[in-house]
C-alpha cells in the first residue's frame, strides 16, 4: 500500500497525496480549518459515487459542536463554470447565513475547482477553500497553484483570481470512477511535466504505458446503490489497485514538478510559463476543436508540434521527438489532428492554418504581436527558463503538411557543412531482427527512429521476441534477445503502415512464431499502398517449405495470415529474387532456426540489389552465423543451423540512401557537404553514389573508409551522365534524376541526356518511382524517357529554364505519392527553381505535398535542409485545386438485373453532366463485340467474373475521379475482389449507388425477358445471396419502383435527379432562414396515401417521416416509403425521425441495432434531414454525425413529462451537447404546464441564437410557442389521422394566430396592366392565401399608365404588398424601381414588383422561372448540359425563354423567327455566354450536329405558322430523337390550350408538350413565394387557375 506524501508549495506542506485517505481528508479539514460552516460543492455526477457518499456521511459524523455542513450540487460540464452559476451559489451562501469563517470544499474536476475557488476568492472578500480534485487532470494541474476562474461567452477563464487553497487533498481512489477518456486526457499533463522537468519519471512512464492502458481499457460500468438517496446509479469502475504504485507515482511526481515551478513563480511571470509546453499550439487546436476534443488531447498534439518546432531549430534531437510521440501514443493520446479516430471524434472539423495562428496570437505568454512557445532541449529539460519567440513562418511550416521551398538564393558558395543522416533503414531493420532472434543483450546505437523501425519494434514486442528498453535518454535501444524461444502468436493484426522492409522480414519471422493455447496464427497488414506491394515470391518459397500462409485480400500482397502451427522445415529453398532482395534477406536471417540446414537457391535470373544480400550476410556474421556462398551453383547460399549470439553493442551506420540528399545539395548548389560516417567500407551500395554518379557529373569527391565529402562545381555547370548502372544503389536513382535535370553539356547532339538503368525494382516500391519521377519532373519542364529497367532524364540547357510547377489555374504542388524518397529528391530541385534570378526579384516558391512522408527514413530532413543547409521554407494551407473534391467523383451503379440501371444511369449522367459507360458494353468492345451471353456460354461464369473485375478496377483506377457514371452488371458483387474494389472506391469518396426495386415485380419481368443470359438458379435465390453484398458495397441507395404510366416515369426521373444532386452536393440542402414549417406524418404506410401527401405538405418546407409509426422497419419497406414520399411531393425535403418511447415515440428504447440500421438506410437514401435524439448512446450519435454526408442533422430533445422548466440547466446542457455534436439544427420540445412556461421558452430562444433552434411547448397551453417559433415549426394537417404531438397546429392555424397577434400584416397585392379582365392572377394568389391562412388580398388594377401605378399603389397604398405586371407596363414600370434583379436586367422587363420598405421597390422577372420550372416539372432535367435548346420567336417572352434555357445549362441555344432581321439585335443584346445562334436559312440547320431536346415557343398562337418558319421548326424537331431525355416543348401562350406548334411537335415528332397554363402558374407561384416567403400550395393553385 502506498504511503501518504506531503508536497510543499510556496513554503507550506499543503498538498497531500495518498490512496483511500478519506479519514485523513476529513480530519485535516476539521482540525486545520476550524469553522462554523463547511460547504461541500460538487456536480451531480460525483453525487452518484459511493466514495463521495461515504465522505459526506463521515464529514457529518465528525463535525464538532457548533459547526454545520452544507452541500451544494451543480450540473456537470463546462457550462456550469459561469457567472450565472457563481451568482446562484453566492445567493445560496448568503441565504444560508454563511460568514467570513466559511470553508468551501471543492470536490470535483477542473470545472468545480476553478469555479468554487473563484467564489471563495470573492465571497465576503475571500474565504478559505480546500481543493479535493477527483479527475487526473485536476489532481496534477488545475488544483495546484491557486488559479481560479469562470468562463464568459467571449472565452474560457477570462475572469478569475489567484487564490491559494488552504489544502489540496489528493486521493487516488477517486480515479476508480473516472471515465476512460478523461483518465487518458489527464495523462497529457502528466507526460508534459515529466517531459519538461523530470527525465527519470519520463522513462518510468514509458515502461509502464502498456500496464496503464490495459487497466484503463478494462474499466466496466457497475450499478451501485446511493447511500444518500437509495437510488440505483450506474458508474464507471477502473481497477486502480492493479496499477496503484504506477498511478500514485505519476500523480505525485507530476504534482512535485508543478509545485516546484509555482513556488518559484506564483504569478506566472517567467518560469511558470514552462508549464505551458504544448499549450501554445494545443490551445489553438482546442479553440477550434472544442468541445469535441478534450484539453489533454489537444495539448498532446501541441506537444508533438512544439517538439517538432524545436527539432526544426536544430535544438531537440529526432530521437527525443520520436520518444515523446511514442509515449503519447502508448497512453492512448493523439499526436496529430489527422489521426483517423481523432478526426471521427472531432467530427472531421478542419483546422485552417490562418485560424490556428490567429488563436495562437491570443496567448498570455506572448509579448504584443510576438508569439512565444516553450522550446524543449531534451526530455526532462527546456531550452532557457521561459518561452521563446517564434515566427509565423516557422509555425506555418510545423502546422502543415504542405511545404513551400523558396529558391536557394542566399547560400554562400564557400558554405561547408557536416551532416549526419539517421541510421540506415536497411541495417536498422536487420539489426532488430537479428538481435531479437539472438541470445543476450545488445545495445543498438544510431537506430533509425522512423515509421518503419517503429512498426518493427512494435512487432518484435507484440510477438514477445525480445525485451526492449532504452538508454542514453532514448538514443540507445537495448534488446534482450531470447534466442527465438519466446516468439508467440498475438491476437491483434500487426499493422505495418507502408513499411515494405518490415513486412518482408516479418513474413519469414512469422514462420518461427509459436502458437499459444488461444492463438494459432498471426496477421500482417498495412496501409492501402502496402496492400498493393508484391510479396508473392517470398510467400511461395515459404509455402513450399511447409509454412501455411493465406492471402486475406489481394493475391500476392498483404494482408496475410501465417499459421503458427506449421513449421519452417529448411533444406533446399528456391526463391525468385528478381523483384526484391528483401525476400532473400528475410529467409537468410531466419534460416538458422529452421529444422534443417538451409540451401537457399535464387532462381529466375540475376537477383536484384545483390549488395543488400551481401550486407545481410556480413551482419549475420557479426551475430555469429557464417553463410557460405556456393562455388558450384550461381546465387546459392548454405546457412547452418544455429543461434545468433548478440554482440554487446552494435552501431548502425548512417543511411547511405539518405546521405545522397545532402551530398546532391552540395553538387547542385556548388557548396561542400561532408557525411562523416559513410565511406568506401560501407555495407551499403548507395555509398557509391558520390563516386559513381556525382564525380563523373563534375563534383570533387573525397572519400575515406568512413567518410564522404562532396564539393559541387559552380552552379549550372553539372554534366549529364551518359550511362550509369544503378543496380547496386537503386534507391539513389531518384536523387540522380533531380541532379540530372539541371545537368547540361556543350554537345548540341546530346540532348543533355543522363541514362540510368538497373532500377526495375523501383516500380514496386512505395509507389512506381520511375513513373513518379517522370510525372513530377515534367511539371518543372524536364523531359524524360522511360526505359524497360530505367529512365533517361533530358537535362535543361540552363537552370533558369526550370519552371514553377503550374497549370492553367496557377501553381500546383509536387506530388510525393506518400514516398519519402520522392519528397526528399524534389525538395532539392524545388530550391533550384528561380535560384539564379536577381536577388531582389520576388520568386514564387515550389510547393511540396505530404512532407511528413519523409518520416519513414528521415523525419528531420526538412529541419536539416532549413537549419543546417540554409534553405528558406514555409508552410501553406492546401491549395483548393490540390485538395480532393468530390465534385467530380464518379458514380458506380449496382443492383439486380431489371432494377433500372441502364435507364437511371442515363438520367444520372444527364443530371450531373457526367460521361456514361456501360461496363457490359465495354466488356463487349474489349472482346471483339462478343455479347456477355455468348462469352458465358463459351467460357463460363467464373471467367466472365474475372474479366468483369479486371475491367471495373481498370476504369476506377483511370476514371474514378473524372466525372463518369459506370453502369455495372447485376453480378459484379459475386466476386470478392470486385466487392473490395467497390468498397475501396466508396471509402475514397466515390459514389456506389445500389439501385433496387420490389423483388416480386423484378422476378415477373425477368422471367419474360429472353435477351439476357439465363440464370443457373432461381432469381429469388440470387437476390437472397446478393442482397447483403449490395448493401455492404454501396454507400448510397435508391428505390426505383416500376412505373406504369409516363407521368409516373417523369415523376421518378425528377425524384432521382434531385436525389443524385443532393447526395453529390450539387443541390445544397438549405436550412430555412425565415418563418417555416414541416409537417409530421403519422401514417403506418404511405402506399394508400399518395393522393393526400401533396395537400398535406402545403405551406411546408419539409415533411417528417415518423419511422417509429411505420408498419415495419425492414430496409425495403422503409426505402419504399421514402421513394413514395419523394415521388408524391416532388421531392420536398424529408426529415427522417425515429422517436424512441422515452422521447415520446413508438420505437423501443434499447433496440440500438435496428436503430443503427434505420439511420444507415436514411443516410444511404440521402434524406435531407435526420432527427438525432440527444439521449441516445454517444457512439451512435458520433457514428451518424461522421457518416452524415450532405444530410443535415437535427439534434432533438423532448420533455414529455414536463420535468424541466425552460430555466432549468437541463436545456442549457442539452444545447451545449448539441453544439458538441455539431448538429445543424437544435430541436427542443417542452411541456407547458402554465402560460408562463411560454415566456420562459422565449427567453431561452432569445439567448440561444448561435444555431438554428426549433423550440416549442406541447399541450394547448403551449400553442403560442408554436406560433412564435421561427424555423421549421412542426405542424399537423387536417388530412392526417392524428397529430404527432399534443398541441400541434396546422400551417393555416399558426398563420391566423400570428396575424391576430400582429405578426403578419395584411397586404393588398394587384395585377396591373391592360387588358386584365380575364387575368387568372387573383384566383391564383387568393387560393394560396386562403389555404395557408394568410390575411392578404389580391385584386386587379387595370391601367395603361405606369405613372398611375406609382401614384395609386407604390406611393398611395400604405398596405401595398406587391404587383404582378403585365402588358403594356413591363418596360414602363422599370423607371420606378430602386433595384433590379439580374433576371430583370437581362430580360429587359419587369413582371414582379417587390416592396423593400421605406417606399423602395425591387423589380424582378419570374417569366423565366415559369418556363424553367414548367419544363423541369415535365421531366426535363435540372441540368441539360449535353443538349442544345431552341427558342421559336424573337419577341419579349423569347428573352425570358433564352434566360431560362441558359439557366438549365444548354450548351447552345438556337433561335428561329419569321423575321430573321430581328435575330441579330436580340442576340447582341444578351450575354455572349448564352451562346445563342440565330438561324437564317433552312440549309444551315442540316449542318448542326447537336441534339436539341428542349424548346420554347414564343410566337403568337392565334395565327398559323409562316411556311419557312414551320420548315425550320420541323428540321429542329427531328433532332430531338436522340436527346438524353424525352424532348420537351413548352408553349408560352396559354390560349388556346392547344396551339399549332404543340400539335405538330406532339403528333408528328413525338415531342412531349407543355401547355402555357403551366408556365403561367409556375411564374405566379414564384411571385407568391417572393412576396409571402411561404411555399405555395402548387396543386391547389394549378387546379383553381385551370379548372374552367
Swiss-Prot record:
Region annotated 3-dehydroquinate synthase, chain positions: 1-392
The protein's required cofactors: Zn(2+)
A Pfam family recorded for this sequence: Shikimate_DH
Family, as annotated: In the N-terminal section; belongs to the sugar phosphate cyclases superfamily. Dehydroquinate synthase family.
Protein name stated in the entry: Pentafunctional AROM polypeptide
Originating gene: ARO1
Chain spans, region Shikimate kinase: 890-1080
Sites where the protein binds NAD(+): 43-45, 78-81, 109-111, 114, 134-135, 156, 174-177, 185
Record keyword NADP present: yes
GO MF: 3-dehydroquinate dehydratase activity; 3-dehydroquinate synthase activity; 3-phosphoshikimate 1-carboxyvinyltransferase activity; ATP binding; metal ion binding; shikimate 3-dehydrogenase (NADP+) activity; shikimate kinase activity
Binding site for ATP: 895-902
Record keywords: Amino-acid biosynthesis, Aromatic amino acid biosynthesis, ATP-binding, Cytoplasm, Kinase, Lyase, Metal-binding, Multifunctional enzyme, NADP, Nucleotide-binding, Oxidoreductase, Transferase, Zinc
Taxon lineage: Eukaryota, Fungi, Dikarya, Ascomycota, Saccharomycotina
Pathway, per record: Metabolic intermediate biosynthesis; chorismate biosynthesis; chorismate from D-erythrose 4-phosphate and phosphoenolpyruvate: step 2/7; Metabolic intermediate biosynthesis; chorismate biosynthesis; chorismate from D-erythrose 4-phosphate and phosphoenolpyruvate: step 3/7; Metabolic intermediate biosynthesis; chorismate biosynthesis; chorismate from D-erythrose 4-phosphate and phosphoenolpyruvate: step 4/7; Metabolic intermediate biosynthesis; chorismate biosynthesis; chorismate from D-erythrose 4-phosphate and phosphoenolpyruvate: step 5/7
Region (EPSP synthase) residue spans: 405-871
Cofactor, free-text remark: Binds 2 Zn(2+) ions per subunit.
Enzyme Commission identifier(s): 4.2.3.4, 2.5.1.19, 2.7.1.71, 4.2.1.10
Amino acid at each position: 500500500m502506498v504511503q501518504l506524501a506531503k508536497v510543499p508549495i510556496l513554503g507550506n506542506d499543503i498538498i497531500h497525496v495518498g490512496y483511500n485517505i478519506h479519514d485523513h481528508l476529513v480530519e485535516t479539514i476539521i482540525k486545520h480549518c476550524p469553522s462554523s460552516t463547511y460547504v461541500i460543492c460538487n456536480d451531480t455526477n460525483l453525487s452518484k459515487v459511493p466514495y463521495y457518499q461515504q465522505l459526506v456521511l463521515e464529514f457529518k459524523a465528525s463535525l464538532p459542536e457548533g459547526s454545520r455542513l452544507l452541500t451544494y450540487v451543480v450540473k456537470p460540464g463546462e457550462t456550469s463554470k459561469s457567472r450565472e452559476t457563481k451568482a446562484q451559489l453566492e445567493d445560496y451562501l448568503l441565504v444560508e447565513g454563511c460568514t467570513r469563517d466559511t470553508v468551501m470544499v471543492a470536490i470535483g474536476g477542473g470545472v468545480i475547482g476553478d469555479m468554487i475557488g473563484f467564489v471563495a476568492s470573492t465571497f465576503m472578500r475571500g474565504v478559505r477553500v480546500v481543493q479535493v480534485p477527483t479527475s487526473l487532470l485536476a489532481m496534477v494541474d488545475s488544483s495546484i497553484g491557486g488559479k481560479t476562474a469562470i468562463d464568459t461567452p467571449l472565452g474560457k477563464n477570462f475572469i478569475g483570481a489567484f487564490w491559494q487553497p488552504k489544502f489540496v487533498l489528493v486521493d487516488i481512489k477517486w480515479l476508480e470512477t473516472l471515465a476512460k477518456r478523461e483518465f487518458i486526457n489527464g495523462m497529457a499533463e502528466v507526460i508534459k511535466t515529466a517531459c519538461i522537468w523530470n527525465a527519470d519519471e519520463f522513462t518510468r512512464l514509458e515502461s509502464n504505458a502498456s500496464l496503464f492502458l490495459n487497466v484503463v481499457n478494462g474499466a466496466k460500468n457497475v450499478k451501485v446503490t446511493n447511500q444518500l438517496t437509495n437510488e440505483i446509479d450506474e458508474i464507471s469502475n477502473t481497477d486502480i489497485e492493479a496499477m496503484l504504485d504506477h498511478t500514485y507515482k505519476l500523480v505525485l511526481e507530476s504534482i512535485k514538478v508543478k509545485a516546484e515551478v509555482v513556488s518559484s513563480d506564483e504569478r506566472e511571470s517567467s518560469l511558470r510559463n514552462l508549464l505551458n509546453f504544448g499549450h501554445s499550439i494545443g490551445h489553438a487546436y482546442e479553440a477550434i476543436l472544442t468541445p469535441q476534443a478534450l484539453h489533454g488531447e489537444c495539448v498532446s498534439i501541441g506537444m508533438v508540434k512544439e517538439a517538432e518546432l524545436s527539432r526544426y531549430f536544430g535544438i531537440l534531437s529526432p530521437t527525443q521527438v520520436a520518444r515523446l510521440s511514442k509515449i503519447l501514443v502508448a497512453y492512448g493520446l493523439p499526436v496529430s489532428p489527422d489521426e483517423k479516430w481523432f478526426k471521427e471524434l472531432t467530427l472531421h472539423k478542419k483546422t485552417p492554418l490562418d485560424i490556428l495562428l490567429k488563436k495562437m496570437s491570443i496567448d498570455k505568454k506572448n509579448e504584443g504581436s510576438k508569439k512565444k512557445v516553450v522550446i524543449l532541449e531534451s526530455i526532462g529539460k527546456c531550452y532557457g527558463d521561459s518561452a521563446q519567440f517564434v515566427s509565423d513562418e516557422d509555425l506555418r511550416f510545423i502546422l502543415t503538411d504542405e511545404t513551400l521551398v523558396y529558391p536557394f538564393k542566399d547560400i554562400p558558395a564557400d558554405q561547408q557543412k557536416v551532416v549526419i543522416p539517421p541510421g540506415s533503414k536497411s541495417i536498422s531493420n536487420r539489426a532488430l531482427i537479428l538481435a531479437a532472434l539472438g541470445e543476450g543483450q545488445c545495445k543498438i546505437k544510431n537506430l533509425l527512429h522512423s515509421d518503419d523501425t517503429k512498426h518493427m519494434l512494435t512487432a518484435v514486442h507484440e510477438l514477445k521476441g525480445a525485451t526492449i528498453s532504452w538508454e542514453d535518454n532514448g538514443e540507445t535501444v537495448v534488446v534482450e534477445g531470447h534466442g527465438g524461444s519466446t516468439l508467440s502468436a498475438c491476437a491483434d493484426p500487426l499493422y505495418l503502415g507502408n513499411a515494405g522492409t518490415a513486412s518482408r522480414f516479418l513474413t519469414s519471422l512469422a514462420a518461427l512464431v509459436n502458437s499459444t493455447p488461444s492463438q494459432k496464427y498471426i496477421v500482417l497488414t498495412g496501409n492501402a499502398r502496402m496492400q498493393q506491394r508484391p510479396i508473392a515470391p517470398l510467400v511461395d518459397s515459404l509455402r513450399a517449405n511447409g509454412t501455411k500462409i493465406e492471402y486475406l485480400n489481394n493475391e500476392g500482397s498483404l494482408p496475410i495470415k501465417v499459421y503458427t502451427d506449421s513449421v519452417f522445415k529448411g533444406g533446399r529453398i528456391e526463391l525468385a529474387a528478381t523483384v526484391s532482395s528483401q525476400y532473400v534477406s528475410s529467409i537468410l536471417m531466419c534460416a538458422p532456426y529452421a529444422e534443417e540446414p538451409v540451401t537457399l537457391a535464387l532462381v529466375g535470373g540475376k537477383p536484384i540489389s545483390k549488395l543488400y544480400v551481401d550486407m545481410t550476410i556480413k551482419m549475420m556474421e557479426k551475430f555469429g552465423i557464417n553463410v557460405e556462398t556456393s562455388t558450384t551453383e550461381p546465387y546459392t547460399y548454405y546457412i547452418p543451423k544455429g543461434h545468433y549470439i548478440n554482440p554487446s553493442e552494435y552501431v548502425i551506420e548512417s543511411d547511405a540512401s539518405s546521405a545522397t540528399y545532402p551530398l546532391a545539395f552540395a553538387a547542385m548548389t556548388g557548396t561542400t557537404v561532408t557525411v562523416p560516417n559513410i565511406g568506401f567500407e560501407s555495407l551499403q551500395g548507395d555509398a557509391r553514389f558520390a563516386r559513381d554518379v556525382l564525380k563523373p557529373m563534375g563534383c570533387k569527391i573525397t572519400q575515406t573508409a568512413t567518410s564522404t565529402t562532396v564539393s559541387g562545381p559552380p552552379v549550372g555547370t553539372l554534366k549529364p551522365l551518359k550511362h550509369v548502372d544503378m543496380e547496386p544503389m537503386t534507391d539513389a536513382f531518384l536523387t540522380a534524376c533531380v541532379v540530372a535535370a539541371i545537368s547540361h553539356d556543350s554537345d548540341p547532339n546530346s540532348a543533355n541526356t543522363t541514362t540510368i538503368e538497373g532500377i526495375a525494382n523501383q516500380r514496386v516500391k512505395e509507389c512506381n518511382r520511375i513513373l513518379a519521377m517522370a510525372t513530377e519532373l515534367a511539371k518543372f519542364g524536364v523531359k524524360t524517357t522511360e526505359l524497360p529497367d530505367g529512365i533517361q532524364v533530358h537535362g535543361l540547357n540552363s537552370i533558369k529554364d526550370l519552371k514553377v510547377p503550374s497549370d492553367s489555374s496557377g501553381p500546383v504542388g509536387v506530388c510525393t505519392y506518400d514516398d519519402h524518397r520522392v519528397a526528399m529528391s524534389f525538395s532539392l530541385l524545388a530550391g533550384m527553381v528561380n535560384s539564379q534570378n536577381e536577388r531582389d526579384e520576388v520568386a514564387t516558391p515550389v510547393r511540396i505535398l505530404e512532407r511528413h512522408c519523409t518520416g519513414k527514413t528521415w523525419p528531420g530532413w526538412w529541419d536539416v535542409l532549413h537549419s543546417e543547409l540554409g534553405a528558406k521554407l514555409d508552410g501553406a494551407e492546401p491549395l483548393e485545386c490540390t485538395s480532393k473534391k468530390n465534385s467530380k467523383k464518379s458514380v458506380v451503379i449496382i443492383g439486380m438485373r431489371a432494377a433500372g440501371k441502364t435507364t437511371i444511369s442515363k438520367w444520372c449522367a444527364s443530371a450531373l453532366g457526367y460521361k456514361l459507360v456501360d461496363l457490359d458494353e465495354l466488356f463487349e468492345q474489349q472482346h471483339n463485340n462478343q455479347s456477355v451471353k455468348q462469352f458465358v456460354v463459351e467460357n463460363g461464369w467464373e471467367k466472365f467474373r474475372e474479366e468483369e473485375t479486371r475491367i471495373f478496377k481498370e476504369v476506377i483506377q483511370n476514371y474514378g475521379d473524372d466525372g463518369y457514371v459506370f453502369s455495372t452488371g447485376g453480378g459484379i458483387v459475386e466476386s470478392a475482389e470486385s466487392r473490395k474494389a467497390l468498397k475501396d472506391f466508396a471509402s475514397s469518396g466515390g459514389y456506389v449507388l445500389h439501385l433496387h426495386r420490389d423483388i416480386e415485380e423484378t422476378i415477373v419481368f425477368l422471367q419474360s425477358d429472353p435477351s439476357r443470359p439465363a440464370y443457373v438458379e432461381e432469381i429469388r435465390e440470387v437476390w437472397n445471396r446478393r442482397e447483403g453484398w449490395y448493401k455492404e458495397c454501396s454507400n448510397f441507395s435508391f428505390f426505383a419502383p416500376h412505373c406504369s404510366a409516363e407521368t409516373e416515369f417523369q415523376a421518378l426521373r425528377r425524384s432521382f435527379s434531385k436525389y443524385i444532386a443532393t447526395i453529390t452536393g450539387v443541390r445544397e440542402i438549405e436550412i430555412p432562414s425565415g418563418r417555416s414549417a414541416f409537417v409530421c406524418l403519422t401514417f403506418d404506410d404511405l402506399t394508400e396515401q399518395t393522393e393526400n401527401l401533396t395537400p398535406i405538405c402545403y405551406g411546408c418546407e419539409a415533411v417528417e417521416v415518423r419511422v417509429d409509426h411505420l408498419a415495419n422497419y425492414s430496409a425495403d419497406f422503409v426505402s419504399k416509403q421514402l421513394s413514395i414520399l419523394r415521388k408524391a411531393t416532388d421531392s420536398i425535403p424529408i426529415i427522417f425521425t425515429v422517436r424512441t418511447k422515452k422521447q415520446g415515440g413508438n420505437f423501443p428504447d434499447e433496440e440500438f441495432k435496428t436503430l443503427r440500421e434505420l439511420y444507415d438506410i436514411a443516410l444511404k437514401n440521402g434524406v435531407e434531414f435526420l432527427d438525432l435524439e440527444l439521449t441516445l448512446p454517444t457512439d451512435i450519435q458520433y457514428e451518424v454525425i461522421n457518416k452524415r454526408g450532405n444530410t443535415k442533422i437535427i439534434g432533438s430533445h423532448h420533455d414529455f413529462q414536463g420535468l424541466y422548466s425552460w430555466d432549468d440547466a437541463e436545456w442549457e446542457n442539452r444545447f451545449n451537447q448539441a453544439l458538441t455534436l455539431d448538429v445543424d439544427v437544435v430541436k427542443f420540445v417542452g411541456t407547458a404546464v402554465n402560460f408562463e412556461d411560454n415566456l420562459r421558452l422565449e427567453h431561452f430562444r432569445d439567448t440561444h441564437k448561435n444555431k438554428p433552434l426549433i423550440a416549442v411547448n406541447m399541450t394547448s397551453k403551449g400553442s403560442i410557442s408554436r406560433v412564435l417559433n421561427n424555423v421549421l415549426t412542426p405542424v399537423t394537417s387536417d388530412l392526417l389521422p392524428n397529430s404527432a404531438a399534443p398541441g400541434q397546429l396546422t400551417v393555416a392555424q399558426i398563420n391566423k394566430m400570428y396575424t391576430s397577434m400582429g405578426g403578419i400584416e395584411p397586404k393588398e397585392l394587384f395585377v396591373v396592366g391592360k387588358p386584365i379582365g380575364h387575368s387568372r392572377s387573383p384566383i391564383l394568389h387568393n387560393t394560396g392565401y386562403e389555404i395557408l391562412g394568410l390575411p392578404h388580398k389580391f385584386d386587379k388594377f387595370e391601367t395603361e399608365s405606369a405613372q398611375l401605378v406609382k401614384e395609386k399603389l407604390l406611393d398611395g397604398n400604405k398596405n401595398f404588398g406587391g404587383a404582378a405586371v403585365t402588358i403594356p407596363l413591363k418596360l414602363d414600370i422599370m423607371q420606378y424601381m430602386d433595384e433590379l434583379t439580374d433576371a430583370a436586367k437581362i430580360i429587359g422587363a419587369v413582371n414582379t414588383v417587390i416592396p423593400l420598405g421605406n417606399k423602395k421597390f425591387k423589380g424582378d422577372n419570374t417569366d423565366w422561372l415559369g418556363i424553367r420550372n414548367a419544363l423541369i416539372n415535365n421531366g426535363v432535367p435540372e441540368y441539360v448540359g449535353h443538349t442544345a435548346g431552341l427558342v421559336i420567336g424573337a419577341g419579349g417572352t423569347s428573352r425570358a425563354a433564352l434566360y431560362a434555357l441558359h439557366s438549365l445549362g444548354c450548351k447552345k441555344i438556337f433561335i428561329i423567327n419569321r423575321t430573321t432581321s430581328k435575330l441579330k439585335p436580340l442576340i447582341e443584346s444578351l450575354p455572349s455566354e448564352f451562346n445563342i445562334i440565330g438561324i437564317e436559312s433552312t440549309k444551315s440547320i442540316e449542318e448542326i450536329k447537336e441534339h436539341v431536346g428542349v424548346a420554347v415557343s414564343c410566337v403568337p398562337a392565334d395565327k398559323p405558322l409562316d411556311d419557312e418558319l414551320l420548315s425550320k421548326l420541323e428540321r429542329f424537331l427531328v433532332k430531338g430523337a436522340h436527346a438524353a431525355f424525352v424532348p420537351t416543348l413548352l408553349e408560352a401562350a396559354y390560349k388556346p390550350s392547344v396551339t399549332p406548334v404543340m400539335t405538330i411537335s406532339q403528333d408528328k415528332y413525338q415531342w412531349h408538350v407543355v401547355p402555357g397554363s403551366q408556365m403561367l402558374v409556375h411564374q405566379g407561384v414564384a411571385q407568391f413565394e417572393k412576396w409571402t416567403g411561404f411555399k405555395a400550395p402548387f396543386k391547389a393553385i394549378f387546379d383553381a387557375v385551370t379548372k374552367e
